[in-house]
Design a protein with these regions (language model features):
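A generic secondary-structure micro-motif detector
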Residues: 11, 50, 105-106
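Short amphipathic alpha-helical segments, especially helix-boundary/capping motifs
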Residues: 17, 34-41, 88-95
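Conserved N-terminal helical subregion
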Residues: 2-6, 57-142
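A conserved FAD-binding loop/helix module that cradles the flavin
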Residues: 53
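N-terminal Rossmann-like FAD-binding beta1-loop-alpha1 element of flavoenzymes
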Residues: 4-34
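Glycine-rich FAD pyrophosphate-binding loop
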Residues: 26-49
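Short glycine-/acidic-enriched loop or helix-start segments at secondary-structure transitions
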Residues: 21, 44, 138
Length: 142
C-alpha cells in the first residue's frame, strides 16, 4: 500500500474479530487489508489452538446479522438451553441460559472464521496470509 489515504485501514489478524470488523469497515467505504501470520485455514488443515466450539448469544447474533452471515451460521449452530451442574453430593441443578424458549448456540469456531473471511473478501477486503507484523512506524500512522 504505497499511497496512504484516510480511507485505508490495516488490521492485524484474520481471526473472528479482525474478519468481522473488516466487513463493517469495508461496507463503510474503507480500503481494508488484513495481515494474518497463519496460512489460509480455508485451504490448509490448521490447528487453531482454541476451543472447537464457541457459544453465541444475542449480541453475537446481532454482529453476524449486520455482517450478512447470520442465516449461514444458524444452519450449523446447535441450541443450548441451559447447563447442568453436578455438586459433590451428587445432586443435579439445572440452570437455563435465559427465559423459557431462549438459548445460546454452539458453533464451530473454524467454520465461523472461514465464513467471516470469505464474506470479508466478498466485500473487497484483501487478506495477506503468512505475514507477520514485525514493527510499526508510529510516525506514519494516523
Amino acid at each position: 500500500m504505497s499511497s496512504r489515504s484516510s480511507k485505508e485501514i490495516i488490521i492485524l489478524g484474520a481471526g473472528l474479530v479482525g474478519s468481522l470488523f473488516s466487513i463493517y469497515l469495508a461496507r463503510r467505504g474503507y480500503s481494508v487489508h488484513i495481515f494474518e501470520r497463519r496460512a489460509d485455514m480455508r485451504k490448509e488443515n490448521i490447528i487453531a489452538g482454541r476451543s472447537i466450539n464457541l457459544a453465541l448469544s444475542d449480541r453475537g447474533w446481532r454482529g453476524l446479522k449486520g455482517a450478512g452471515i447470520e442465516d449461514e451460521i444458524r444452519k450449523v449452530a446447535i441450541p443450548m438451553h441451559g447447563r447442568v451442574i453436578h455438586n459433590l453430593k451428587g445432586e443435579i441443578t439445572r440452570q437455563p441460559y435465559g427465559e423459557k424458549g431462549q438459548s445460546i448456540y454452539a458453533t464451530s469456531r473454524g467454520i465461523l472464521n472461514c465464513v467471516l473471511m470469505t464474506e470479508a473478501e466478498k466485500n473487497g477486503v484483501v487478506i495477506h496470509f503468512n505475514e507477520r507484523c514485525t514493527g510499526i512506524d508510529r510516525k506514519s500512522v494516523v
